[in-house]
Amino acid sequence: MQVIIISGLSGSGKSIALKVLEDSGYYCVDNLPASLLVVLINHLQTQQHAYVAVAIDMRSGENITVLPWQLKMIDKSIQIKFIFLEARTETLMQRFSETRRRHPLSDKNITLEEAIRREREALATLTGLGHHIDTSSLRPNVLRAFIKDFIADSRSPSQLTLLFQSFGYKHGIPLDADLVFDIRCLPNPFYDPQLKELTGHDPEVIRFMESQPDASKMLRDISSFLGTWLPAYIRDNRAYLTVAIGCTGGQHRSVYFAEKLALHFHDSAHVLVRHRGLAEYKPHYARR
């Protein structure tokens, strides 16, 4: 039996993630009080459900800090995957404004910003339980695609998933990054009029990057660092490791680096690539 637990901040995309799981054949339970997790799983196991997804957050009004204890009580034969979704405060405020929904912790005595802050503090102990996704810059279709890839990976044999994410510093560092590499010191294709509108996927940009000695050296250095320490993360039983590569806009250099690193480590782990700065990006697994 496999159980995917979804938690995170209100407005971060939990409903979207749960709907994708439901459409993928998971038996889904929304807004479960954390104290009932073990009871629910034991019951569903007797009903022979193979794939279960559960959303647990602040809506139940219960103390969610019992969740880590509940997870320890689950039978070891059951595979547990945990997804924590969050977004920047300004992004969440904009989403609540657009949908005109009420934040579950808001009342007439506190502002929306204060409600978000309180929820973030209450959920802080859960951020390290599993895979952490910052949805601040993710469109709904992009989040759906990522959850689908997460499902595909969860149904494969257990192994570290290594996620390479390109991003632009002008939009902020991804909240879910475990390691961050800043490559803004490298020559920028953006200033070449013939390359400005292209991306790190395009052959012209690839040739430009490959012609830069510093880019090649930095790529080797990052590869060497990850190659040295990746076995330690695997020995630590990490399920996910997110490596963020940042340039100015997240369009050229970081995209090129993320793709190159993904190919380099293709045989060392389940490798997933995500490009936050590309409007039409879809998450994908590296292929040789």
From Swiss-Prot:
Pfam family, one: PapZ_C
GO terms assigned for molecular function: ATP binding; GTP binding
Domain of life from the UniProt record: Bacteria
UniProt keyword Phosphoprotein present: no
InterPro entries: P-loop_NTPase, RapZ-like, RapZ-like_N, RapZ_C
Keywords annotated in UniProt: ATP-binding, GTP-binding, Nucleotide-binding
Binding-site residues, GTP: 57-60
Protein task: Displays ATPase and GTPase activities.
Entry's family note: Belongs to the RapZ-like family.
Protein name (Swiss-Prot/TrEMBL): Nucleotide-binding protein NE1849
Organism: Nitrosomonas europaea (strain ATCC 19718 / CIP 103999 / KCTC 2705 / NBRC 14298)
Classification of source organism: Bacteria, Pseudomonadati, Pseudomonadota, Betaproteobacteria, Nitrosomonadales
